Amino acid sequence: MPIRHCIVHLIDKKPDGSPAVLHARDSELAASDAIENLLADLNDSYNAKQGKAWGLFHGESGAYPFSGWLKQYLDEEKDFATFSRVAIEHLQKLMEESNLSTGGHVLFAHYQQGMTEYLAIALLHHSEGVAVNAELDVTPSRHLDLGQLHLAARVNLSEWKNNQNSKQYISFIKGKNGKKVSDYFRDFIGCQEGVDGPGETRTLLKAFSDFVEKEDLPEESAREKTQTLVDYATTQTKLGEPVTLEELSSLIDEDRPEAFYDHIRNSDYGLSPEIPADKRTLNQFRRFTGRAEGLSISFEAHLLGSKVEYDEEAGTLVIKGLPTQLIDQLKRRKD
């Protein structure tokens, strides 16, 4: 993972309305194994976070100046240290306006992964721990706690520069349960939500369910293809990459690699060729299966409570919205 530029600043602030004190670094961090390891661990932690949002920059303005400074840096009108300095001063101002904000070390990193360039910005905090020193004494030890990553954003610079119609070149961590504590950080980046990750994922899963029903796939085949979809999408979320519909289609059916993709294109699902999958939504798409005495039942977990109702005391399932093929067979049997 080639790191182009990296720098860390410190904003000292407590969530009590006190002033935010900036301790800015003047020069970039020199390349080192420690920096490589830090960024690799940060990427892993960020990719694993659930509940991220995807979007795009607001139009450049006095309220949202970040994208303009970033463009000046990419156009080589500002060096990286200068860009990060004006950005961190803006973040300091927004922190002071947000009484609930807490300071910390702010990392700016411009790096490349594969053929794609990214800018990562993260507010990092320390945790207290212990270590054993060379004399085998147990001593206090402070370390950056990447497991408690609550404020971070990543800009896909390549996508931003090369695809003006994209609405998902920025990802950022959203506040839990609608909390407004992180709003100042989103305003700092100047980001607006452009893609509803959970909604897009639900639409993708709906399209897949429709595809399975339309193809009238055997239970084993449906289960295998469901697992393929979930495994691929989960892997993409871990890598911080979107789900590519054409690639997914080829994995679902190697003999007919375009079948699922054509199903999506020919129906009114409104999905983009690439979508940011939501891990929490994917976890709801597991299948329940059971077989006994000539009876075989298989359904997706997210249908439980809507189309499928389970009565634990009675040991029964109530299924609503039966497949058309099954209804036709039952009618013919009755006749």
From Swiss-Prot:
Signal peptide: none annotated. It is found in: Cytoplasm, Nucleoid. One of its GO terms (cellular component) is bacterial nucleoid. PANTHER family: NUCLEOID-ASSOCIATED PROTEIN YEJK (PTHR38772:SF1), PTHR38772. NCBIfam families: PRK00378.1. Belongs to the YejK family. This is Nucleoid-associated protein PSEEN4449.
